[in-house]
Amino acid sequence: MSSTLVLETTAYTLEQLIHLDAPQIALAGRSNVGKSSLVNALARRKQLAKTSSTPGKTRSVNYYRVEPEGFYIVDLPGYGYAQCSKEERKKWAKLIEKYIVSCKSLRGLAVLLDCRLDPQRLDVDLTSYARANNIPLLPVLTKGDKCKLRERSDRQKQWAVLLGGRKPLVTASMTGLGIADLWRELRALAAGGLSADDEAEDAPSDTIDAIDDVTA
């Protein structure tokens, strides 16, 4: 099945977050992890989501409707961008947490992880938060084309240890690597086909305060 994305609405404040009965999958990741590029790759369009070499550009919650299936991929502000005020980082952290805790139709959290980097603290915090709150988790390595095969495999193994054996998918927006596999996972997640990890002993808390280094 061929799917694409349509930007339906954007929320910049807590009050602008919308209620949708349709299944939603949140897309989260650090600044400059390649979220916008991945959205464009999923949509097979170059400029649906604006991309930039400068981190800190996505400062809103963007609701993309998946056609023809009808579920939503919701692009959250990125985290870990230090070149903005602490007040602004906290604002976007609250926006992310409010979306996650209030979304009754949230089917899962797709966390984007830079294939070039060892597991980062903020990424580990977010995945632990999801597991502690029984949110089905879909880990996705981005920029796989920037890594050699051995490096990709090593990174998958690193994350598998942290995620109870779950290896992340490897993707590359520029080459299309893993995009078809990612679509299959997203459809399954929207249909309730994936389940949260049973073990969450590594989760530090049931709040998302640890990632208040936010904006992407």
Swiss-Prot record:
This is Probable GTP-binding protein EngB. Belongs to the TRAFAC class TrmE-Era-EngA-EngB-Septin-like GTPase superfamily. EngB GTPase family. PANTHER family: ENGB-TYPE G DOMAIN-CONTAINING PROTEIN, MSS1/TRME-RELATED GTP-BINDING PROTEIN. The keyword GTP-binding applies. InterPro entries: G_ENGB_dom, GTP-bd, GTP-bd_ribosome_bio_YsxC, P-loop_NTPase. The keyword Magnesium applies. Keywords: Cell cycle, Cell division, GTP-binding, Magnesium, Metal-binding, Nucleotide-binding, Septation. Its cofactor is Mg(2+). One of its GO terms (molecular function) is metal ion binding. Pfam families: MMR_HSR1. Mg(2+) binds at residues 36, 58. Necessary for normal cell division and for the maintenance of normal septation. PROSITE patterns: G_ENGB (PS51706). Residues 21-192 form the EngB-type G domain. The gene is engB. One of its GO terms (biological process) is division septum assembly. Residues 195-216 are annotated as: Disordered. The lineage of its organism: Bacteria, Pseudomonadati, Thermodesulfobacteriota, Desulfovibrionia, Desulfovibrionales. GTP binds at residues 29-36, 56-60, 75-78, 142-145, 170-173. Residues 196-216 have a biased composition (Acidic residues).
